[in-house]
């Protein structure tokens, strides 16, 4: 739901000049989504939306160049707290179990952090495989995951 809502937000701001959180919330409600101002505010922050000039003394929301997350660590903390159910490891692999449908979002956020020890992730519906190199770095990565979970 969250991913779909955020994708809709990106489509809306690309096609409609939206200047305020209230206006964005109204547009989402018009499309059948139940949202609060707090939800819209979090989505704006997680998506890293910026305000750009839209005429004289007017501004509108826009996606940042390249649409990279501005605060991927903060988003990952929230995703870990909300989604991760179990973490296990073997050799240079870490397996993260999540609630159904959330693994891709968690893996995408992990990838955006560009940790040098993580050479890649593979996500299914509720499972993420994290590949660590060298295998001696697994303990370091697991500690980071624990810290994320403690938020």
UniProtKB/Swiss-Prot annotation:
Compartments it resides in: Cytoplasm
GO-annotated cellular components: cytoplasm
Any one GO MF annotation of this record: DNA-binding transcription factor activity
Highest taxon of source: Bacteria
PANTHER family assigned to the protein according to its UniProt record, in alphabetical order: ARGININE REPRESSOR
Function: Regulates arginine biosynthesis genes.
This protein's name: Arginine repressor
């Amino acid at each position: 739901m969250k991913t779909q809502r955020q994708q809709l937000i990106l489509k809306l701001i690309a096609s409609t000049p939206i200047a305020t959180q209230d206006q964005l919330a109204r547009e989402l409600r018009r499309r059948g989504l139940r949202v609060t101002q707090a939800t819209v505010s979090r989505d704006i922050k997680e998506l890293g939306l910026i305000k750009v000039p839209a005429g004289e003394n007017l501004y509108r929301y826009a996606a940042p160049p390249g649409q990279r997350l501005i605060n991927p660590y903060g988003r990952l903390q929230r995703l870990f707290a909300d989604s991760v159910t179990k973490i296990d490891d073997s050799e240079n692999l870490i397996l993260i179990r999540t609630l159904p449908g959330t693994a891709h979002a968690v893996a995408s956020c992990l990838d955006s952090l560009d940790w040098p020890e993580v050479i890649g992730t593979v996500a299914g519906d509720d499972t993420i495989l994290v590949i660590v190199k060298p295998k001696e770095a697994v303990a370091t990565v697991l500690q980071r995951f624990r810290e994320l979970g403690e938020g």
